[in-house]
Amino acid sequence: MSNVIIDLKNIDITFTQKRRTIQAVKDVSIQIEKGDIYGIVGYSGAGKSTLVRAINLLQVPTAGKITIGEDVTFENGQVQLTTKELRQKRQTIGMIFQHFNLMAQKTAYENVAFALRHSKLSNEEKDKKIRGLLELVDLADRAENYPAQLSGGQKQRVAIARALANDPEILISDESTSALDPKTTKQILSLLQDLNKKLGLTVVMITHEMQIVKDICNRVAVMQNGQLLEEGSVLDIFSNPQEDLTQEFIETAAGIEDALAKINAQPLVKNLPASALLVQLKYVGSSTDRPLLTEIFKDFGVSGNILYGNVEILGDTPVGELVVVLDGDSDKVIAALKAIENAGVSLRVLKKGAQ
């Protein structure tokens, strides 16, 4: 039995506006497995939200095939389920949004209850479930509060409880932390991770922030102009991006872009000696354990001056990055660069000293 819960094959989504054809999604194929926290990242207009509307059964693709769980939902531009089956399938997918979409005149309790209005549960069972969900998102004491009495993070917790009311297998987060401050964002991401573990929930994160992908996801797809640029494990994508846009996202998340701007403004780098190189090193896994700069000084007499360093854990794997000035005899520096690459460290020369 397949572990794939969302299977998109060659999805096209086309719109016609004022006699103009717009292809919002172009030949996208993605497989998401049960229990994944899967990120779909891209800038505005990349096609992320349009693709999600097809996943949550609100948008019929122009072409391609979508399978949710064991059921083919759309194929070749046609709905493959009856109206009743489609409605039942939608209940297996929960959704949270950037602006919460809570009803202002209803309490937190009533907002969650609204999702159960068609449930066959008794009133007593509904009450137990609603209070259990509010406790699950750490809002048991806020049941009678209205949205205006809640913080942004608390509103999103109510929205999450509401999205879980019908016991979905999949939870889609469409920019759900974009309106939150950094501290609250981390709290919501932590909650989603907990729900993923406790409930076996498959989470799909739609975002334009690679930091969110890095913090919570195990796999990621990068989209641009409706197309899938690259897809893979977060570790693989972060340690070895294949596309310029992906590299741009990663540099933004790591803060390396700002760091490089400051490094390049330093007198040492502005006036880099002829014998020196400014290099960027990327370490993955066990290669982070080696004292490489100590080794190349010992073996080649090449000094390493660290200007920037960062180590993070992606999954269970450490990923490190250094920006260093290597200085020494030219033939020794070349030998040191080869030794670094042979150690499994990715290397990029950022600047050569003035000759």
From Swiss-Prot:
SUPFAM superfamilies (alphabetical): ACT-like (SSF55021), P-loop containing nucleoside triphosphate hydrolases (SSF52540)
UniProt topology in membrane: Peripheral membrane protein
EC number: 7.4.2.11
Record's catalysed reaction(s): L-methionine(out) + ATP + H2O = L-methionine(in) + ADP + phosphate + H(+); D-methionine(out) + ATP + H2O = D-methionine(in) + ADP + phosphate + H(+)
GO MF entry, a single one: ATP binding
One GO cellular component, as annotated: plasma membrane
Domain ABC transporter: 8-250
Cross-referenced InterPro entries: AAA+_ATPase, ABC_transporter-like_ATP-bd, ABC_transporter-like_CS, ACT-like_dom_sf, MetN_ABC, MetN_ABC_transporter-like, NIL_domain, P-loop_NTPase
Cell membrane listed as a keyword: yes
UniProt key word Transport: yes
Pfam families per UniProt: ABC_tran, NIL
Compartmental location: Cell membrane
Binding-site residues for ATP, renumbered to this chain: G42, Y43, S44, G45, A46, G47, K48, S49
Alphabetized UniProt keyword annotations: Amino-acid transport, ATP-binding, Cell membrane, Membrane, Nucleotide-binding, Translocase, Transport
PANTHER family listed in its UniProt record: AMINO ACID IMPORT ATP-BINDING PROTEIN (PTHR43166), METHIONINE IMPORT ATP-BINDING PROTEIN METN (PTHR43166:SF30)
Its job: Part of the ABC transporter complex MetNIQ involved in methionine import. Responsible for energy coupling to the transport system.
The family this protein is said to belong to: Belongs to the ABC transporter superfamily. Methionine importer (TC 3.A.1.24) family.
Quaternary organization: The complex is composed of two ATP-binding proteins (MetN), two transmembrane proteins (MetI) and a solute-binding protein (MetQ).
Stated name of the protein: Methionine import ATP-binding protein MetN
Lineage: Bacteria, Bacillati, Bacillota, Bacilli, Lactobacillales
